[in-house]
Amino acid sequence: MLTRLFSEPGLLSDVPKFASWGDGDDDEPRSDKGDAPPQPPPAPGSGAPGPARAAKPVSLRGGEEIPEPTLAEVKEEGELGGEEEEEEEEEEGLDEAEGERPKKRGPKKRKMTKARLERSKLRRQKANARERNRMHDLNAALDNLRKVVPCYSKTQKLSKIETLRLAKNYIWALSEILRSGKRPDLVSYVQTLCKGLSQPTTNLVAGCLQLNSRNFLTEQGADGAGRFHGSGGPFAMHPYPYPCSRLAGAQCQAAGGLGGGAAHALRTHGYCAAYETLYAAAGGGGASPDYNSSEYEGPLSPPLCLNGNFSLKQDSSPDHEKSYHYSMHYSALPGSRPTGHGLVFGSSAVRGGVHSENLLSYDMHLHHDRGPMYEELNAFFHN
């Protein structure tokens, strides 16, 4: 809309006079409805705006009248001011929202006070102490279990899982003995003990029970090679892929080349009386003997190859350079038998490559020297 300045002298005559402008001028009559009397139209030559520009007067509450252009100007100014205020309020609200918003998503982390830090530290210390005591109790229980199971070694220690497996097999073997009511064969007993165990643990159990671990391997080949046939049966010779450390290469090849169905007519004699004495002295339950001899405290040497049969042997000290067998050593004690028969499996025979045809069985050598004690102990497993 076009606006005009009221300073022009031609427009001052057109401005209506209001009752409130005068100092108590109440000469103008008022209607009951508050409408002012109609004003006469302006003179055409007075320079006033024409009919197109003339606006109807707007009556107010007190009978005041203002022209329409003035009212439109007031409305425009009010709308512009309201929009500016709304924009300012929106900007302030955004600033406040950005200031209150946390930097990271998720629940707001509680502020750690000194009391909360002390409580958290105390809880952590108690949890660590409980876990430490639990592990100490578990290790102590496993150590006690290792003393009970039939496996003993001063240099090696069974792992936790192997200890539990051996204890389970030991309990199963004892329950089978109670169920059958018979004394088991040593080989079947060791087979039950070593079921599911690793090869190092199997060798350790066999060494404690003074047996060759090859005689009770639980997994047999399809052709039956390396199978133990029991008392009175032949050994099926099994070729070994690694060479013998104590014999010459030709002798090991001769011992290993007998596989593939060829078997020696070697009778499986009974176990040595010294082995059975150690086993029976513990009550027949398979408890491990306590070795006090310094001969068995050294590390294990490579397996000893004798006609295809491998057995573990301790590294002997310079005092034990004779390298005679454990059973021959204890069987040669006074009161057992003459020492001449105890050198059948001696070091000279081993180094000389004695074949199985030249070796006499244990029963043939010592039958006339056996006393009642040997007969009774041997009958413990072969009744």
UniProtKB/Swiss-Prot annotation:
A motif (Nuclear localization signal) lies at residues 108-114. Expressed in the external germinal layer (EGL) and internal granular layer (IGL) of the cerebellum (at protein level). Expressed in layers V and VI of the neocortex at postnatal day 1. Expressed in all layers of the neocortex at postnatal day 4. Strongly expressed in layer IV of the neocortex, particularly in the barrel cortex at postnatal day 7. Expressed in the CA1, CA2 and CA3 and dentate gyrus of the hippocampus and many nuclei such as the habenular thalamic nuclei, paraventricular hypothalamic nuclei, amygdala nuclei, and pyramidal nucleus. GO terms for cellular component: nucleus. Disruption phenotype: Mice exhibit small brains, ataxia, reduced seizure threshold, growth failure, and postnatal premature death. Show excessive apoptosis in central nervous system. Lacks nuclei of the lateral and basolateral amygdala. Organization of cortical neurons into barrel structures is disrupted; thalamocortical axon terminals fail to segregate in the somatosensory cortex. Residues 102-114 have a biased composition (Basic residues). Residues 1-130 are annotated as: Disordered. PROSITE patterns: BHLH. Its main location: nucleus. Residues 79-98 have a biased composition (Acidic residues). It is found in: Nucleus. Keywords: Activator, Developmental protein, Differentiation, DNA-binding, Neurogenesis, Nucleus, Transcription, Transcription regulation, Ubl conjugation. GO terms for molecular function: DNA binding; DNA-binding transcription activator activity, RNA polymerase II-specific; DNA-binding transcription factor activity; E-box binding; protein heterodimerization activity; RNA polymerase II transcription regulatory region sequence-specific DNA binding. Transcriptional regulator implicated in neuronal determination. Mediates calcium-dependent transcription activation by binding to E box-containing promoter. Critical factor essential for the repression of the genetic program for neuronal differentiation; prevents the formation of synaptic vesicle clustering at active zone to the presynaptic membrane in postmitotic neurons. Induces transcription of ZEB1, which in turn represses neuronal differentiation by down-regulating REST expression. The C-terminal region is necessary for depolarization-induced and calcium-dependent transcription activation. Interacts with TCF3, TCF4 and TCF12. Interacts with CDC20. Efficient DNA-binding and transcription activation require dimerization with another bHLH protein. This is Neurogenic differentiation factor 2. It comes from Mus musculus (Mouse).
